[in-house]
Regions:
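Aromatic- and acid-rich polysaccharide-binding/catalytic face
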Residues: 96-108, 167, 174, 179-196, ...
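Glycoside hydrolase catalytic-domain groove-lining segments
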Residues: 260, 266-322
């Protein structure tokens, strides 16, 4: 693990101590956050407003290496050895950075492992969900996972069951659109298909916004010193499909959709796009994927006042294999 991590060593920013906590919301800093999602390894790269030249950055360690102690491997000193900012005592969630996976009781369509069929949690779709119940459970999860009410680090809400833009629920998320149209058909049996789709879109997006906005607001109210945001936004969907049709830039349609959810970015303290890489992409295509997604995140950040920071999630294991990124990131 340390050999893999050495690929990403960098000179720490002169304005911060390696043992310091997460940055304030108003201080521009370059950072790399090393983190994990389930059993995978993550890195978070906080880009300074200038994308052309990054002179220094900090590394934040948020990997559950406390589990390695039983095997004789001890990681609690990586902050001293590699100038890494690390949660005290090498905890996964701690004073510097904490991530919440699917917290609360968001409406969702979940799969039963035994039958592979979907069942509804809290109504299945946001327009059928109980917001009060969700927020009550979210607050309970927040108290359990981040008990320190003075937590002043980075707080990430990782909710990926559906996206607040109705159209973007495609592929494996198509059931959310199907259920939304079905609900409208039951409410309006004589409406045309186009009318049903428009009403499904309107209600899904209005209530989806309410769930995401109120969750973020509650997190900020209960842990006001932390810097909060949602993982993976803004979406871009670049470098997908056949090689001949892949594009570095987010499509104009996606950019317009991201403009429609400025409420999400205005309500966040930090913007957390994802630039996970696929091994099947060529090195130049991987560069294009990163550039396009970071460019879109910075574009969105430039529309916020005050301008939000951008922390980019980069997993240093490919998403389509178990191979580590090596040469392509040197």
């Amino acid at each position: 693990l340390l050999q893999s991590f050495q690929q990403f060593r960098a000179k720490p920013a002169s304005s911060s101590s390696p043992s310091s906590s997460a940055p304030s919301k108003s201080t521009p800093t370059n950072m790399v956050y090393v983190s994990t999602r389930s059993t995978t390894l993550w890195m978070l790269l906080l880009l300074l407003q200038n994308l052309v030249t990054i002179k220094s950055f900090e590394v934040y360690w948020n990997i559950p290496t406390f589990m390695c102690n039983q095997f004789g491997f001890e990681f609690s000193s990586v902050n001293r050895t590699y100038s890494v900012v690390q949660n005290r005592n090498d905890t996964f969630r701690g004073n510097a950075v904490s991530i919440l996976y699917d917290p609360g009781k968001f409406p969702a369509l979940l799969e039963k492992p035994s039958t592979k069929t979907l069942y509804k949690r809290n109504g299945g779709v946001p327009q059928e969900g109980n917001l009060t119940e969700h927020l009550e459970i979210f607050e309970r999860h927040l108290d359990e996972l981040i008990p320190d009410r003075n937590f002043s680090g980075i707080g990430i809400i990782d909710f990926e069951s559906w996206r607040p833009i109705y159209r973007q629920n495609f592929g494996s998320l198509q059931p959310y659109k199907d259920l939304s149209v079905k609900i409208e058909r039951e409410r309006h049996p004589y409406w045309s298909g186009n009318h049903l789709e428009r009403e499904a879109t309107r209600r899904f997006e209005a209530t989806g916004r309410e769930f995401m906005e109120q969750t973020l607001l509650l997190a900020k109210q209960r842990r006001p010193q932390a810097a909060w945001g949602y993982y993976a936004f803004p979406y871009c969907f670049n470098m997908n499909g056949a090689a001949s049709t892949r594009s570095e830039n987010c499509s104009p349609e996606v950019q317009r959709e991201n403009n429609r959810i400025m409420w999400l970015f205005d309500g966040s303290d930090i913007i957390f796009p994802s630039v996970y890489l696929r091994e099947k992409l060529s090195p130049s295509e991987r560069e294009q994927l990163i550039r396009g997604r970071v460019r879109e995140a910075v574009r969105v950040a430039q529309r916020t006042k005050p301008r939000r920071k951008v922390l980019t999630y980069l997993r240093y294991v490919y998403t389509d294999s178990i191979q580590y990124l090596t040469e392509c990131l040197r």
